[in-house]
From Swiss-Prot:
Pfam families linked to this entry: Ribosomal_S7 (PF00177)
Keywords in alphabetical order: Chloroplast, Plastid, Ribonucleoprotein, Ribosomal protein, RNA-binding, rRNA-binding
Protein name, per record: Small ribosomal subunit protein uS7cz/uS7cy
InterPro entries registered for this protein in UniProt: Ribosomal_uS7, Ribosomal_uS7_bac/org-type, Ribosomal_uS7_dom, Ribosomal_uS7_dom_sf
Family listed: Belongs to the universal ribosomal protein uS7 family.
Amino acid sequence: MSRQSETKKRTAKSDPIYRNRSVSMFINHILKDGEKSLAHKILYRAMKQIKRKTKKNPLSVLRQAVYRVTPNVAVKSRRVGGSNYQVPVEVKPARGKALAIRWIVGASRNRSGRSMASKSSYELIDAARNTGSAIRKKEETHKMAEANKAFAHLR
C-alpha cells in the first residue's frame, strides 16, 4: 500500500472570456492533439452561434444543457461468483458534470455537419431543449440502471 498522502482534487481553471469552469472543462474535452487554441476557437464560435440562433445568453444555454444531460445514476460492472453484474450506483455531482460534458462533446463529434463549432452549437441547443443524442445517452444510462435495480445490494 502506498505511503504517500492522497492527491488533492484539481479543479479546472476558469476560461479567459466567460470566466467559467464549465466552459474551461468543455474546451479541455474538445481538445485534440494538444491544440488548445483551436479548441478555444471552436467553443467560442459555437457560443456566438448559440447567441445568434437563440437570442439568449450562451452561457445559460450551456449550463442548462449540462444540467439536463447530467446523470443521477449509472451502472458499474461488478464481478461476483464468476459472473459480471451491472450494479447501479449514484453519480457524484463532479463526475456527473464530467460525464455530461463528455457525452455532449461526443454527440457533437458524431453529428453530421461541416464544422465542429456548428455541430457543438446545435448539440448544446438540443440538450438545453431536452432533445438530442446526449440526452438519449443519459436516458439509456438511466434505463440500464433501472433494469438492473435488483443488483443494487451488490454494491
